[in-house]
């Protein structure tokens, strides 16, 4: 039964339903009267919807509510923003109010994670964290007073300049069948770890940004940050937006500072109060935190860089803005919009917003603007508020539709904006519909949200009747079709050729495939997939000796798609600091191409590479969810990949990432609009298709990196191996909290010996091994100048000494 809330005659919500709901949540926690059902979720002047509002106090009660709704063919509605979506006001259903689900279950100050229920507000969480010496991230424009709703919605934090990933680890989700899904490593053991990634594909990431269409989130585990010794900021005033944008783009690429937030006069006046006459047109706030000595150094160097722009210091604003850096900023008005954009497009987009405001009779002085530098100056997050009494929803809807055409990326679009964006991405809605179909087959959860009745599901390939599989005659026909597809020289079923494709980088012997084919384009891969399904032949992709995920050759023969000819794409975008590669482009080649490009003056670009061979395909390693050596600073491949092109099993092409939206361009944001479906393709062992192109982030590195980067090794004299290991673990925790290292690696004696022997004449590997510590801790630091490196080394030395460790000096 398909349930479309507000349209079905049999979706009854009578007295019996009210009594059953009260039996679940208790008397007084169900509201059915029209004037009460909307609770605080309606804007002033909104009509009263036909809802039953129910307030559960536990996840188990949410399960019971979902089961009750499904059994009675009633839709479940949730409000993931401050106000209900306009499209939900005309729907009938049970609205879940999470206000009573408000426990801060646990705060883990060692691992910097808080486990909070959905009803916990920002105010409540801040009060709970304050005595513990930790804090949460600070949103620029929170969509909800609920911490969980804000973070699961990927709301942008002020610190997105340095910390571009959203601070979400795990979720507890009530599915449409009433079962509870615990995402990430919580699916195995909540107490052991709070890892975001599952053992295989990141299927549970579907619930991020999904606004509860696949499941109802009731709890989240969120990242925390330590409260540092020093917190400060610089404030510079500017009169022109173009000069502000230069500073927002260029200075973050030096990696000095945490936040880069530009606020116009109208928004600053609303934030701080007062007349605002003394405020500049734009105030650029650059935030710093850490050890006092390091903060003072970085503040001084960033201040020197800011002097070259046409602005002036506004020291009188520093105390107030330093305090504001860690405050939660809500959406500042009911007339609000926000989006990501590439730097070259911001001025045109800003002018469009201004024109629309004037057309809606909103004065120039009443248009609030906030611009945030994203991930070291790759892009901008732009926030706009029209400070007026009138409801400008229609004008903003029209504005947003026009902004998409100019390159604005809205990551959680709804209504007409959502339809324009989702229908513009080939195969996006069919994939979403397919996921919805098996997670919520009866369409109970937020029916009509994102997906509509007319949206077609992804069509799985069908194997026709007749001879299929690994038979002699069938394979002969397949080989003929494959040769017609890519050319005779690039297809072989010769045993001599197949032997070399029967081994891989694992302990398994592998089996020879029946056919090897070497395509050179995405279009040819599409044809191969269609031929394979037409004849019922398994397909396995391979690149540079490493398969996409499983690192194993098919055990049953089939078609091995060798992608080594697809090695022609290696395109660097220095504006967005990204590189786009095809499957066979090797890591060492990406490095040499990237370093040719500048991030800013004195700074070039570099890829972040995993600890593997330079001859390995970058695409294959990233798709296999490889971890770079600098994962402590930059994250894993899932956090740095911004676009992928996949050939699905039915031969259709599916692009994931903002760049898949027509007109957006190469926007380096690591997630799709709406539900985060890109996670399912990572570490999936090729189950969902073949990746033919991938775009990933590059990172800034100083040109004189040899002088401004140093690798240190820490160890201890503790003779007991286990106690020594525990000291290393404790020291690693403390070092990580400082956010000052490029690289942290608890190595082994062999790795240390190889490093020493390669750098010191007259020392053999055997000699180096004899003097190696049992648990070496490799730490790499870099900096703006030699003074910054010296400060960081001093901090590391202090931490290691605290744990009775020392820095090894091989000389």
Annotate each PLM feature:
Residues 105-107, 118, 123-247, 251-253, ...:
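FAD-binding subdomain of flavoenzyme oxidoreductases
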Residues 260-264, 268-319, 742-775, 780, ...:
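Terminal amphipathic helices with adjacent charged low-complexity linkers/tails
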Residues 41-134, 146, 150-156, 502-600, ...:
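Long, structured ligand/cofactor-binding scaffold of large enzymes
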Residues 17-20, 244-270, 346-363, 392-400, ...:
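Short amphipathic alpha-helix segments
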Residues 235-240, 286-292, 339-345, 382-389, ...:
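Short beta-strand-to-loop capping motifs
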Residues 61-64, 124, 241-246, 292-300, ...:
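Short, conserved charged micro-motifs
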């Amino acid at each position: 039964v398909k349930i479309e809330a507000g349209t079905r005659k049999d979706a009854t919500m009578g007295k019996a339903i009210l009594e059953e709901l009260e039996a679940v949540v208790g008397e007084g926690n169900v509201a059915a009267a029209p004037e009460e059902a909307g609770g605080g979720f309606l804007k002033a002047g909104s009509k009263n919807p036909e809802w039953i509002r129910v307030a559960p106090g536990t996840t188990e009660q949410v399960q019971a509510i979902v089961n009750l709704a499904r059994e009675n063919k009633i839709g479940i509605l949730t409000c993931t923003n401050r106000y209900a979506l306009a499209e939900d006001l005309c729907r009938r259903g049970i609205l879940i109010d999470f206000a009573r689900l408000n426990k801060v279950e646990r705060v883990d100050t060692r691992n910097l994670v808080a486990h909070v229920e959905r009803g916990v507000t920002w105010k409540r969480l801040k009060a709970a964290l304050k005595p513990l010496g930790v804090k949460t991230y600070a949103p620029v424009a929170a969509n909800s007073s609920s911490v969980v709703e804000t973070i699961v919605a990927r709301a942008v934090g002020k610190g997105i300049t340095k910390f571009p990933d959203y601070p979400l680890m795990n979720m507890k989700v009530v599915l449409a069948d009433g079962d509870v899904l615990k995402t990430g490593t919580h699916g195995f053991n909540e107490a052991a770890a709070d890892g975001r990634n599952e053992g295989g594909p990141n299927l549970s990431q579907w619930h991020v940004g999904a606004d509860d269409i696949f499941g109802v989130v009731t709890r989240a585990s969120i990242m925390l940050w330590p409260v540092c010794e020093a917190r400060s900021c610089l404030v510079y005033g500017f009169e022109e937006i173009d000069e502000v944008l230069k500073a927002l783009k260029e200075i973050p690429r030096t990696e000095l500072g945490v936040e880069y937030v530009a606020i116009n006069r109208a928004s600053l006046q609303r934030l701080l109060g007062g007349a605002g006459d003394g405020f500049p047109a734009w105030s650029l706030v650059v935030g710093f935190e850490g050890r006092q000595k390091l903060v003072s150094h970085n503040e001084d160097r960033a201040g020197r860089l800011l002097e070259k722009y046409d602005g002036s210091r506004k020291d009188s604003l520093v105390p107030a803005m330093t305090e504001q850096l860690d405050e939660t900023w809500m959406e500042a008005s009911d007339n609000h919009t926000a989006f990501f954009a590439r730097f070259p497009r911001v001025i045109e987009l800003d002018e469009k917003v201004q024109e629309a405001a004037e057309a809606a009779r909103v004065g120039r002085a009443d248009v609030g603007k906030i611009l945030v530098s994203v991930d070291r100056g790759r892009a901008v997050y732009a926030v706009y508020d029209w400070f007026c009494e009138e409801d400008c929803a229609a004008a903003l809807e029209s504005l947003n539709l026009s902004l998409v055409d100019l390159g604005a990326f809205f990551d959680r679009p709804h209504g007409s904006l959502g339809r324009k964006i989702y229908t513009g991405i080939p195969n996006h809605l069919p994939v979403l519909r397919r996921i919805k179909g098996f997670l919520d087959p009866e369409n109970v959860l937020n029916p009509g949200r994102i997906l509509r009745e007319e949206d077609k599901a992804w069509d799985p390939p069908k194997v026709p009747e007749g001879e299929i599989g690994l038979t002699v005659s069938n394979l002969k026909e397949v080989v003929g079709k494959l040769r017609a597809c890519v050319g005779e020289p690039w297809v072989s079923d010769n045993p001599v050729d197949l032997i070399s494709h029967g081994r891989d980088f694992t302990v398994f012997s592998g089996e020879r495939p029946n056919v090897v084919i070497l395509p050179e384009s995405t279009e040819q891969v599409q044809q191969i997939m269609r031929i394979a399904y037409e004849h019922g032949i398994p397909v396995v992709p391979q690149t540079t000796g490493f398969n996409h995920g499983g690192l194993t050759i098919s055990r049953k023969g089939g078609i091995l798609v060798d992608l080594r000819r697809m090695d022609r794409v290696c395109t660097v975008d220095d504006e967005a600091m990204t590189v786009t590669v095809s499957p066979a482009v090797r890591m060492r080649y990406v490095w040499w191409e990237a370093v040719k490009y500048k991030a800013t003056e004195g700074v070039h670009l570099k890829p972040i590479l995993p600890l593997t061979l330079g001859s390995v395909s970058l695409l294959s390693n990233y798709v296999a969810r490889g971890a770079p050596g600098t994962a402590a600073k930059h994250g894993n491949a899932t956090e740095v990949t911004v676009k992928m092109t996949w050939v699905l099993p039915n031969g259709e092409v599916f692009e994931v990432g903002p760049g898949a939206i027509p007109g957006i361009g190469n926007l380096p944001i690591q997630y799709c609009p709406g539900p985060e479906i890109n996670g399912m393709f990572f570490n999936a062992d090729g189950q969902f298709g073949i990746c033919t192109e991938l775009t990933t982030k590059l990172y800034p590195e100083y040109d004189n990196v040899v002088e401004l980067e140093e690798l240190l090794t820490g160890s201890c004299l503790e003779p007991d191996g286990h106690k020594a290991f525990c000291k290393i673990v404790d020291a690693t925790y403390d070092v990580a909290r400082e956010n000052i290292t490029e690289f942290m690696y608890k190595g082994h004696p062999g790795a240390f010996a190889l490093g020493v022997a390669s750098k010191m004449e007259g020392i053999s590997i055997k000699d180096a091994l004899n003097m190696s510590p049992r648990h070496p801790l490799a730490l790499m630091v870099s900096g703006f100048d030699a003074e910054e490196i010296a400060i960081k080394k001093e901090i590391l030395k202090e931490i290691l000494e605290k744990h009775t460790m020392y820095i090894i000096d091989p000389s």
